[in-house]
């Protein structure tokens, strides 16, 4: 809470705004179910979702062996000069990994989210997927997701996928240094 809120702590109005954020963001989307890729499982975000979403929260948690995650990042920033860890004048792999693993780093934030998801009171809201299962057994993994979401499964195409594009917008990671 910042000083302005402390000067006029109007909780009801703030709750009204927070409760309308998700609805307003997706109001032009025709889909009944939307899977939003974001940091939902950090402790503060998860609390806000449960309090303001207006429906049960369901999170799909993709987890991967930490050494494999680190190896993937190393391969990325060693082969992509514009990768954001290369933009901080870090001299070696260890310094670049520290950037990712420090308390506010990308990997550390994800690990904290997974840790929070694994708490007994949160597990019922989460479906955990091992990265290796998604890659090697995509169909049974997807069927598990559909069951968790209480939706009817339909066959998917798992090869020769197109770049994600929706509502005329494509996913753009160029700010992270990817071409």
At which residue positions do the language-model features occur?
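PAPS-dependent sulfotransferase catalytic domain
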Residues: 28-158, 163, 168-178
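Non-catalytic, charge-rich alpha-helical accessory subdomains
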Residues: 10, 20-32
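Polar low-complexity intrinsically disordered regions
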Residues: 6-7, 22, 35, 119
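PAPS-dependent sulfotransferase catalytic core
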Residues: 1-19
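Short intrinsically disordered, low-complexity coil segments enriched in acidic
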Residues: 1-6, 152, 178-179
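Well-ordered alpha-helical segments embedded in enzymatic catalytic cores
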Residues: 17, 21, 110-113
